[in-house]
Structures are given as C-alpha cells and as structure tokens.
From Swiss-Prot:
HAMAP family: Ribosomal_uS19. GO terms for molecular function: rRNA binding; structural constituent of ribosome. This is Small ribosomal subunit protein uS19. The lineage of its organism: Bacteria, Pseudomonadati, Pseudomonadota, Alphaproteobacteria, Hyphomicrobiales. GO terms for cellular component: cytoplasm; small ribosomal subunit. Belongs to the universal ribosomal protein uS19 family. It comes from Methylorubrum extorquens (strain PA1). The keyword Ribonucleoprotein applies.
Amino acid sequence: MARSLWKGPFVDGYLLKKADAARGGSRNEVVKIWSRRSTILPQFVGITFGVHNGHKHIPVYVTEEMVGHKFGEFSPTRTFPGHAADKKAKRR
C-alpha cells in the first residue's frame, strides 16, 4: 500500500541536516546513514550516502532516477551464495 499523498515523503530529520552539510563540504565525502526507511529527495542528488545494511555501510551515489525510492532498496542485506550444484551432474 502506498503512502498517503497528504502526509508527504518520510525522511528522518537528521538526514536533511547531514545532506546540507555534505553539499557545503567536499564532493567525495561519504555521508554515513542508518535510515534505510527514508525516501530519497531531489536535494540528495549528487551526494554519496553510506547506507547501512546491518553489517557495513554500502556507498550509494544518488542520481535523479533514484528520487522517490527508499535508501534501503539500494543496499542489499542478504548475500546470495548461489544454488547448490547437482552432485550427479558434477561427477560427470
């Protein structure tokens, strides 16, 4: 279910402050965040965020196509080891 339009997009308050500080600072600085639930806003375009995946921070460079999505969509939490190989096919 989508979020109501009258509520607007959800963004943690500290995230806006960090984004403003990153705009004034150096360009290659990674802003570490733990808020995977926050929506990416147009003012975040061009900033690299380090989105926490439960283990480490994954660098995510925000582009215009990402606006409206959540930060958690770009930082996978699980690693896929691949399907187990068939033992019969492996012996041949």
